[in-house]
Amino acid sequence: MEGSDFLLAGVLFLFAAVAAVPLASRLGIGAVLGYLLAGIAIGPWGLGFISDVDEILHFSELGVVFLMFIIGLELNPSKLWQLRRSIFGVGAAQVLLSAALLAGLLMLTDFAWQAAVVGGIGLAMSSTAMALQLMRDKGMNRSESGQLGFSVLLFQDLAVIPALALVPLLAGSADEHFDWMKIGMKVLAFVGMLIGGRYLLRPVFRFIAASGVREVFTAATLLLVLGSALFMDALGLSMALGTFIAGVLLAESEYRHELETAIDPFKGLLLGLFFISVGMSLNLGVLYTHLLWVVIAVVVLVAVKILVLYLLARLYGVRSSERMQFAGVLSQGGEFAFVLFSTASSQRLFQGDQMALLLVTVTLSMMTTPLLMKLVDKWLSRQFNGPEEEDEKPWVNDDKPQVIVVGFGRFGQVIGRLLMANKMRITVLERDISAVNLMRKYGYKVYYGDATQVDLLRSAGAEAAESIVITCNEPEDTMKLVEICQQHFPHLHILARARGRVEAHELLQAGVTQFSRETFSSALELGRKTLVTLGMHPHQAQRAQLHFRRLDMRMLRELIPMHADTVQISRAREARRELEEIFQREMQQERRQLDGWDEFE
C-alpha cells in the first residue's frame, strides 16, 4: 500500500467505527458485531473502498497482541501455575476432541483426509480477541467459567506451533530430517527471552520512570509489546503468546497499572481494526454461491464446539448455570484459522473453493457469537430472574426495595449485610451467575444481568427505590450507570464506590457526592492505630485522622477543574505541601487541647 492509501484506509476505518459501533450499541447487538458489519460494508464485497484485506488483517493482529499483554499483566506466575490443570487438561481435550469430530465430518464431504485434519484443527480454535472481549463485557473474568475459558484459549495459542509444523508433514513436503541445530537455537532464544525479561525489564522501566516523562514511558511500553511480538514471530511462534509472557513477567512489578494505562487506548483501537478487517475478509461471492452449505457448516461448527465445551465443563465440575456461558463464548472459529488455512493452501492441501468455504464459515461463526451470547443471557435471565422457589423465603416480603445494590463482590457484600441486618429492603443486581443462586438461598432478592440495561433496573424496582449503591468493578460501568440513573431515575440517591482518586474526580464531576474510596477509610483507620502504638494520645490520633480526612477531601474537590490536565501534577505537589503545612499547624493547636472532644468537628 502507498502512504496515501494507508492514510485513506485509516480514515475509512475510523469513520466505519464511529458510524457503526454507536448504531450497533443502540440496536443492542454489541460493539463487536458492529465492527464486523462495518468491515463488510467497506470491504471488497461491500462498497469496495478497501481491497487489500490480507495486509490489513495481518497488521490488525496487533490488537490481539496488545490484548494478550494486558491479560498477562493481570496474571502473576503463581496464578498461572494454578491454572495448569485446566490449561493442559480441559484446553488439550477441547482442541483434540473438536478437531477429531470436525475433521471426521469434513472427510464425509469432498475433503481429502490431510485437508480434513488441517480443517478440523483450524476450526477447533476459537477467537481469542472475541472471546476475551465478550468475557469482559459479560463480567466473566473472575468467574469459574471465565477462568476456564481463558485456560482453553491459552492452550490454543500454545497449540499454534505444532499445528503449523504439521502442515508440511501432511503435504509430504517436509525435509527427511529435522534441522536440530535450528530448533535448538530457537529454544535457546526463547529461554533467553524468559531469563532476560525476568531480570532486566524491571530495572529498565525503573530507569525510564525516573525520567518523569510520561511519553517516554508509553514509548517504552509500545517497544516492549511490539518487540516481543516481532521476536516471537521471527522464531515462528505466536506473537500473542510472546506478549502474554512479557505481561506475566511484569505482573508483579510496581509498574503494572501504569503499563496497562499506557497500552489500553492502542488495544481498543487495534482490536476494533481487527474485527473490521475480519468483516472485510468475508467472501460474499462464495456465500452467495454455496449459501446452503455455508449455513449448514456454520450451524454444525457452532453446535459441535458447544457440545464438546459443555461436556468438558460438566466433567470439570463447572456449575450448571455457567456451562452455557462457557460453551457459547468459545463456540466460534478463530483468527488462527486464517493463518493455518493460508499455510495449508500454499502447500496445495486444499482443492477448488475449499479454503474459501472454510474461511467464510469461520467469519460467519464469529458473527454468530454476540447474538448467541444474547440468547444465553435471555435464557439465564428467565432462569434466575423468575419467581423464587417457595423454600427460598426472603427476609422482607415487600416487592418494592428501598435500596438497589449493583455488584455483590467483597465491597458490595459488606454493604448488603449491613442493610439486611437493619431490616432494609434491598435488591441486588449481579452479573456473576454463579453467585446468584447462593445469594437467593440466604434471603437476598437477586436479579442476574447487566445493570446498565434500563429494563433490568426497572424490573429490579428502580422506579420505587429510594437509593442505589453502585459497587461495580469497572469504573466505566460505574459512570455509565450514574448517567442512566440521572437520566431515567432522577429521584434515586446515588451512592458509589470509587477505586481511587481518578474515579472520585469523575464521580464529583458527574454530581455524585456520596461515594467511598475503597481503601481510603480502612487505610486511615489503620493509620490511626499506628499513631496510637507510637505513643500518641488516642484522642489526638482520632483528631489527626479526622483532620486528614477533611483536608484530603478538600484537596480532592479543588483538583476537580484540573482533572485529566497536565497542570494537575504540579498542583497536586503544591496541594500536598499545603496539606502538610495545615496539618502541622492544626496538630500543634490540638496538642494544647489533649483533653475533651470537639463534637462539632
UniProtKB/Swiss-Prot annotation:
GO MF, any single term: glutathione-regulated potassium exporter activity
Regions crossing the membrane: 4-24, 29-49, 55-75, 87-107, 115-135, 152-172, 177-197, 207-227, 230-250, 268-288, 291-311, 324-344, 356-376
Xref: Pfam families: Na_H_Exchanger, TrkA_N
Domain RCK N-terminal intervals: 400-519
InterPro entries in alphabetical order: Cation/H_exchanger_TM, K/H_exchanger, K_H_efflux_KefB, Na+/solute_symporter_sf, NAD(P)-bd_dom_sf, RCK_N
Keywords: Antiport, Cell inner membrane, Cell membrane, Ion transport, Membrane, Potassium, Potassium transport, Transmembrane, Transmembrane helix, Transport
One GO term of the biological process aspect: proton transmembrane transport
Membrane-protein topology: Multi-pass membrane protein
Localization annotation: Cell inner membrane
A Gene Ontology cellular-component term: plasma membrane
Family per similarity comment: Belongs to the monovalent cation:proton antiporter 2 (CPA2) transporter (TC 2.A.37) family. KefB subfamily.
Role: Pore-forming subunit of a potassium efflux system that confers protection against electrophiles. Catalyzes K(+)/H(+) antiport.
PANTHER family listed in its UniProt record: K(+) EFFLUX ANTIPORTER 3, CHLOROPLASTIC (PTHR46157:SF4)
Subunit structure: Interacts with the regulatory subunit KefG.
Protein name (record): Glutathione-regulated potassium-efflux system protein KefB
Protein species of origin: Escherichia coli O17:K52:H18 (strain UMN026 / ExPEC)
Gene name of the encoded protein: kefB
